[in-house]
Amino acid sequence: GKAKPRLEIEGYPVEGISIGGHETCVIFPTLSLAFDIGRCPQRAVAQDFLFISHAHLDHIGGLPMYVATRGLYRLRPPTIFVPKYLRELVERLFDVHRAMDQSELNHTLVPLDIGEEYELRRDLKVRAFKTYHTIPSQGYVIYSVKQKLKQDYLGLPGSEIKRLKLSGVEITNTVT
């Protein structure tokens, strides 16, 4: 059979499902992250980071299943980003499921407000931005962060750069 065409954004493969009103989950497997969880498609379970845009069930309905399935597969607890106003409600959702099936549902919940940033890795950050929907919602932009050697230190031998760095000199600028 023919290979499925691959969708890429800025060189990152994108997978997922989006059926309006039924299910939305967009996955960036090489970054190990998903935007919204829909009904928890199997492919989403392997992603370490999850970003929830709003509380409609077609975007958040699979959340307990996502965390439970990761636990079943002995994957590390996921980091889940939610709009700040949803934090308490999402924790209550997990508490209800814990009470029903005595599972741990281990995860890290990160409430992000519009404009707030979070460091995913040394070279990757996320920032929440406002979106417009029938209920409060937000989107997330993921961007790379690099440390670039300051102009003054270009051309110096590596040993000298190392010495400066160890002595506490700021030798780099942050580039996004």
Curated annotation (Swiss-Prot):
It catalyses: Endonucleolytic cleavage of RNA, removing extra 3' nucleotides from tRNA precursor, generating 3' termini of tRNAs. A 3'-hydroxy group is left at the tRNA terminus and a 5'-phosphoryl group is left at the trailer molecule. Signal peptide: none annotated. One of its GO terms (molecular function) is metal ion binding. Homodimer. Its EC number is 3.1.26.11. It is found in: Nucleus. This is Nuclear ribonuclease Z. The keyword tRNA processing applies. Keywords: Endonuclease, Hydrolase, Metal-binding, Nuclease, Nucleus, tRNA processing, Zinc. Pfam families: Lactamase_B_2. Belongs to the RNase Z family. Its cofactor is Zn(2+). SUPFAM superfamilies: Metallo-hydrolase/oxidoreductase (SSF56281).
